[in-house]
C-alpha cells in the first residue's frame, strides 16, 4: 500500500486523525491550548501519584507518618509530593481557563462535547477532594467530615447514605481506605472520558474565535499547533517546577501539617482554594438542604448553557453587552473564591449571599435577556 504508514496502519491512523492530520481552524488563539495542557497535567498527576502510592499507607494511624516518610526518606519523595500537590492547583487553573474559553466563544453548542466536559469537571473535583483527605491532617479529617455530612441533607435515606460512605458511624479507617481506592481509580476514569471528549470534538471539528464555520480555512494540527502546544507545555512545567521547588506551600493550608485529631476542631474549616467559590455558595444559604442544592447547581448550571444562549451569534467576540456579563461572572467567581476563605461573620455572610444570587441570576436570567436585546438591536 502506498503512502505513509501512519495513514493506513490500524492503530497509527487513529493517532494520525487525532493529532497529526487533524484539520484545525487556522485562527484559533492561545486560549485553545488549555485542552492539551489539561492532558499534560493529567499524565503528570497519574505518574507522580503512582510513585507516591508505592510509599503511602492508607491507615489512620500511619497515613500522616507515611507522607512525612515520603518527604524525608524516599529519594526525591519531597519533589514528587510537591509536584503532585501543586499539580492539582495547576490542573484546576487550566480547567477553569478551559471552561471560561468555552463560555466566551460558545463551545457549549457542541452539546455532547460540552456535557462530557462538565462530567469531567465533576470527576476531577471528586478526585481532588478524595486526594485532600489522604494526608490525614486536620483539614483532611474535618474537610472529609463536613463534606460527606452534606449527604445527610438528602431526605429519607440521607443519614444511612452518610454511614454507608463512611463505612461506620464516623470518618475512620474504612473511610480513608475507600477514599484512597477511589482516588487511585478515578484519574483513569477521567483519562477514558477524556478520550470520549476528544472523540466527540473531532466529530464536529474545533470551534474558533469568530464563532463562524471554520471549514473555509483549516490547516493540519501538526506542525502548526503541535509546536504551539509544546510552548504551552514548557511554560506550564516551568511554572509547576518553580512553585514545587521555591514555594511548595503557597497554595496549601498550614492546618494540614497538624495530624488529624477528632477532638479538636480547626478555627476555620475550608477546602482547597479551587473549591472556595462553590463552598461560598454552600455557606450563603442558612438551610442545610438548600445549601447542598445550591452547591450542586453551581456546577449543574453549566449543563444549561446551550439552552440559555438566545443570541444569534455564537461567540462573545462581537457582543459588547454579553462581554460585560461574561466579565461580571469572572469577577463574581473570583469574589466568591475570596469569600469562601473568610470567616462566617458580617460582612462576609451578606457579601457571599449577594455574590451567590448574582452568580445564578447572571447565567439563568441576564444572559438570555441580553441575547434577546442584542438580536433586536442588530437584526430587527
UniProtKB/Swiss-Prot annotation:
Cofactor note: Binds 2 heme b groups non-covalently.
One GO cellular component term noted in the UniProt record for this chain: respiratory chain complex III
GO process annotations (BP): mitochondrial electron transport, ubiquinol to cytochrome c
InterPro entries xref list: Cyt_b/b6_C, Cyt_b/b6_C_sf, Cyt_b/b6_N, Cytb/b6-like_sf, Cytochrome_b, Cytochrome_b_C_euk/bac, Cytochrome_b_N_euk/bac, Di-haem_cyt_TM
Ligand binding (heme b b566): 98, 197
Key words of the record: Electron transport, Heme, Iron, Membrane, Metal-binding, Mitochondrion, Mitochondrion inner membrane, Respiratory chain, Transmembrane, Transmembrane helix, Transport, Ubiquinone
Compartment(s) where it occurs, according to its Swiss-Prot or TrEMBL record: Mitochondrion inner membrane
Annotated positions binding heme b b562: 84, 183
Membrane-crossing residue ranges in chain numbering: 34-54, 78-99, 114-134, 179-199, 227-247, 289-309, 321-341, 348-368
Molecular functions (GO terms): metal ion binding; ubiquinol-cytochrome-c reductase activity
Membrane topology of the entry: Multi-pass membrane protein
Cofactor or coenzyme needed: heme b
Binding-site residues for a ubiquinone, renumbered to this chain: 202
Further comment found in the protein's record: Heme 1 (or BL or b562) is low-potential and absorbs at about 562 nm, and heme 2 (or BH or b566) is high-potential and absorbs at about 566 nm.
Record's subunit section: The cytochrome bc1 complex contains 3 respiratory subunits (MT-CYB, CYC1 and UQCRFS1), 2 core proteins (UQCRC1 and UQCRC2) and probably 6 low-molecular weight proteins.
PANTHER family: CYTOCHROME B
Function text: Component of the ubiquinol-cytochrome c reductase complex (complex III or cytochrome b-c1 complex) that is part of the mitochondrial respiratory chain. The b-c1 complex mediates electron transfer from ubiquinol to cytochrome c. Contributes to the generation of a proton gradient across the mitochondrial membrane that is then used for ATP synthesis.
Similarity annotation: Belongs to the cytochrome b family.
UniProt-recorded name of the protein: Cytochrome b
Organism of origin: Branchiostoma lanceolatum
Amino acid at each position: 500500500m502506498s503512502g505513509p504508514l501512519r495513514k493506513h496502519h490500524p492503530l497509527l491512523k487513529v493517532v494520525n486523525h487525532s493529532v497529526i492530520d487533524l484539520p484545525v481552524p487556522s485562527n484559533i488563539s492561545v486560549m485553545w491550548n488549555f485542552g492539551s495542557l489539561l492532558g499534560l497535567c493529567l499524565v503528570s498527576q497519574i505518574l507522580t501519584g503512582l510513585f507516591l502510592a508505592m510509599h503511602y499507607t492508607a491507615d489512620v494511624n500511619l497515613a500522616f507518618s507515611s507522607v512525612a516518610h515520603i518527604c524525608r526518606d524516599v529519594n526525591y519523595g519531597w519533589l514528587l509530593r510537591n509536584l503532585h500537590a501543586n499539580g492539582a492547583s495547576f490542573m484546576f487553573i487550566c480547567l477553569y481557563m478551559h471552561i471560561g474559553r468555552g463560555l466566551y466563544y460558545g463551545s457549549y453548542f457542541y452539546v455532547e462535547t460540552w456535557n462530557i466536559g462538565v462530567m469531567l469537571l465533576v470527576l476531577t473535583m471528586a478526585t481532588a477532594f478524595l486526594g485532600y483527605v489522604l494526608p490525614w491532617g486536620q483539614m483532611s479529617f474535618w474537610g472529609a467530615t463536613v463534606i460527606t455530612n452534606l449527604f445527610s441533607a438528602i431526605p429519607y435515606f440521607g443519614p444511612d447514605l452518610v454511614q454507608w460512605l463512611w463505612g461506620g458511624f464516623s470518618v475512620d479507617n474504612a473511610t480513608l481506605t475507600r477514599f484512597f481506592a477511589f482516588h487511585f481509580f478515578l484519574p483513569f476514569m477521567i483519562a477514558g472520558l477524556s478520550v470520549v471528549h476528544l472523540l466527540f470534538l473531532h466529530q464536529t471539528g474545533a470551534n474558533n474565535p469568530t464563532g463562524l464555520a471554520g471549514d473555509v480555512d483549516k490547516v493540519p494540527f501538526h506542525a502548526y499547533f503541535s509546536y504551539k502546544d509544546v510552548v504551552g507545555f514548557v511554560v506550564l512545567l516551568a511554572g509547576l517546577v518553580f512553585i514545587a521547588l521555591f514555594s511548595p506551600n503557597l497554595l496549601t493550608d498550614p492546618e494540614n501539617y497538624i495530624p488529624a485529631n477528632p477532638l479538636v476542631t480547626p478555627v476555620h474549616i475550608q477546602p482547597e482554594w479551587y473549591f472556595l467559590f462553590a463552598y461560598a455558595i454552600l455557606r450563603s444559604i442558612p438551610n442545610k438542604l438548600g445549601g447542598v442544592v445550591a452547591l450542586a447547581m453551581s456546577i449543574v448550571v453549566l449543563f444549561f448553557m446551550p439552552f440559555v444562549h438566545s443570541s444569534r451569534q455564537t461567540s462573545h467576540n462581537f457582543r459588547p453587552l454579553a462581554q460585560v456579563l461574561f466579565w461580571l461572572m469572572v469577577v463574581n467567581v473570583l469574589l466568591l473564591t475570596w469569600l469562601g476563605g473568610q470567616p462566617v461573620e458580617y460582612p462576609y455572610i451578606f457579601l457571599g449571599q449577594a455574590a451567590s444570587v448574582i452568580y445564578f441570576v447572571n447565567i439563568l436570567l441576564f444572559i438570555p435577556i441580553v441575547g434577546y436585546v442584542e438580536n433586536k438591536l442588530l437584526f430587527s
